[in-house]
């Protein structure tokens, strides 16, 4: 190819390149004016916020920044039981009312959370029987979270009282779009005496009060594990070598049932007052199987 032909080829390709760039630019402008999805089809975005953790003077600044970043909602009261009920039976929602009002000022809807993952210290001290007991005998204590046993009737009663007060206060508030139950609920291997009694009741119901049916399901004829009464059954000792895996599996099912029942009762309480607010929960997907969830039928009221 001669020099003249080479120059002609260069200018032709340059014109084509500029034409393609111009076409792409026009197409980009066209698509920029026509969003792929309608706003109503997009997922809402929000952020957890803990007003009890921050000085009140910072709240408005933070909510404004959330709004400026495009967030549309926030979560409140996830771990705030001590602030909601500083003393047994004495409730204080005044600080939360201020936070809800400020969030609304910046067009942020609120997801209200039940604080059952973090019972206050007065409860642990006054009612130590609510605390989870590990297999090695260690009793969990105040200072972390999720240290209360779902099998404890006392803990449940106190939780339901607090939740009902919260639902009465915010159930008809249009600024509240929904509720989150607990936080990442899970059931540990809980050796609280109430858990063992509840496990036996779970087995009685599952096997229709027929101890032979349980023995057959668990294969207890092997190694002389046969039971003659449900009262002889204890919680499975996972540290013990060759523990009956059917017993462990039924314990996991029991744990899931306890979790579902606790969440279900919370939901029913809230729904008494929150007719136009949805209710859900959250969890970590890598929790051990059986500790969270269950079938959709188990959670039919959590909607």
Kindly give the residue locations of the regions a language model identified.
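Bacterial N-terminal signal peptides
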Residues: 19-29
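Aromatic-lined substrate-binding rim segments of carbohydrate-active enzymes
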Residues: 60-140, 164-167, 265-273
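Short, solvent-exposed turn/loop segments enriched in Gly/Ser/Thr/Pro and often Arg
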Residues: 50-52, 77-80, 113-122, 177-186, ...
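Polysaccharide-binding and catalytic clefts of secreted carbohydrate-active enzymes
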Residues: 136, 140-298
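An acidic-aromatic substrate-binding cleft motif
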Residues: 34-58, 64-72
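Bacterial N-terminal signal peptides that target proteins for export
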Residues: 6, 10-20
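Short, well-ordered coil/turn segments that N-cap beta-strands
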Residues: 40-43, 70-72, 104-110, 172-177, ...
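Conserved small/polar residues in nucleotide/adenosyl-binding loops
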Residues: 302-303
